[in-house]
Amino acid sequence: EIVTSLVADKNDNLCLYGATGSSDFPTTSGCFDNTFNGGQFLHYPQNGTLFSNGTDIYVAKFNALGSTLMASTYLGGSENDGVNNNINTSLYDSLMFNYGDQFRGEIQVDINDDIYIASSTKSPDFPTVNALDGVLNGNQDAILVKLNTTLTSIVYSTYIGGDNKDCGNALTLDDSLNVYLTGGTCSNNFYTTPGSYKPTYTGGRTDGYICKIKYDGSSILNSTFIGTVNYDQSYFIQLDNNKDVYIFGQTQGSMPVTAGVYSKINSRQFIQKLNNQLDTLLASTIIGNSNGQINISPSAFSVDCAGNIYLSGWGGNILVGSSSVVNMPITANAIQSTTDGHNFYLMVLGPNMSSLLFGSYFGGVQSWEHVDGGTSRFDKRGIIYQSVCAGCANNDDFPVTPGAWPTSLYGSNTNQSSNCNNGVFKIDFQLNSALASI
């Protein structure tokens, strides 16, 4: 099993979304689907992940103490679901660009504790209910699913895509429960709305996209491509208090840099801000170390109530192109100002991307920190909760804090694995200090 994304509802119940290859995955009575649907053999040798019988999506909910499985269901069709499937023989294809990109997607909850999933599928019979599009359009489509809080029924479920490959990387909601979906597409006929910011495919092997979908799933209100003539992909999406739309992604092209923003020339990570109708670019910047290469794989993104923009990502030789985080922008208030080139990078920009408020590395001096996919989160106070593959190659150099979770079977300040161990850090950027790390 793979855990791709977590979120807590208003009662602090923990909701999980991921992929499973198990026919005995625990489900609860009356759930939407208690049967494993399976798919094609799938093996990712670069991280050892093997699904002999293919994959389904699973969605599960635990109580706030983690002591009770409140609800759990399968979600899938006859082919692989819940993975951004690499269909080429090479390690990286057009949508699975970074190490770990096969396990992208996101889970969110609304004010009623209904559950939303952004993901990808290759199944022509994925369960669609009240669908915008009930047909698999290409080799792989993005999917958007809304389930009720008990996971007993689908409120709506739809394919989103064109005649090539598409993936769903992230979603967010506004106060009216309209859904904003983002990801990557190789389809030049991906649906966009007339008058949108970029209504036509811009070229290259992949574009990003943003779709705004009506609260009841009945229509696409606004939709646009995001991209250049080269590779581009959007990994995260957020809204500010004005419902302007922000995305965080990667590019190998020349993304626009608007007046008055903080930027680093010849960099390959981008942040863009569009109006709610997705027809106007309000601000755009590129950030990185100016070496012309992609430096980080995005892992978390947020916009706080004041309009400050937070991001997290990791870089190093595991990434395509032997990337490095050396010479990323670092501020005087950094938690860690030096790097071995294979660490996490954390950044905060001021409103409208106008200034660099915070830039720091986080990680060990020898090991190559990374993630094997999935998402982590900031809260609206600007605190990050990040899970990490730490201490890789049996190192003990991941930064840990005094009094962290007890040094026992369940937590340690040393790496008890022959390779990587799970590390977790929590950082409040307003305090400029690590609050907890285990």
Where are these regions (language model features)?
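A sequence-level/structural motif corresponding to short, flexible coil/turn segments enriched
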Residues: 1-438
